[in-house]
Amino acid sequence: MKRFKKVLALVLAGVLALAMLTACDGTTTDPDKIMPEDGTPEVVMTVNNMAANKGLGQVKYSAKYSAVTKALLENWLEYTNNKINNTTYWENYRKITAELGSVKIVVGMTSDYRPGTSDHNPASKTSFKYDSLFKDESTFNLAEKIGVAYVPTSNGTVYQAVCLFDVN
């Protein structure tokens, strides 16, 4: 029994040493499992809590779709700051969303979205209204993934956008 314990201790020490040498700390490399510390975890939690309160499904964070949401938000900011016209806004929108393939934006800056309207998504971070995500609960239930984006402007205002994606 003593010999078994010694062998077990040596094996465990070897495993520990190997883990340290290979820098294996057990953390994930999946970008969707690591949310940026910019308020994104709180947004995802708020959206999922509101959905649960309404009896709706949950959405999972996606780094890929957050990048799409950010590109759409930047395009929206250019339009609202009169740097591009309506035609250019929609050309850019189509280019950004073409990368999605069969994935559809079902809530947020959809193809039905009108950039001049004020539905509080996108909006400045302080005036963002989560209720805007639940206007049509049937479309919310189509979503599996959430994209969250923030873009700071030169005047210090941070804008936020949330898009929900149907990936199936």
Regions found by a protein language model. Name each.
Residues 19-23:
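C-terminal motif of bacterial Sec signal peptides marking the signal peptidase cleavage site
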Residues 1-11:
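Bacterial Sec-dependent N-terminal signal peptides
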Residues 26:
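Short, conserved catalytic or interaction motifs in soluble domains
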Residues 1, 32, 36, 122-126:
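Intrinsic-disorder-associated interaction segments
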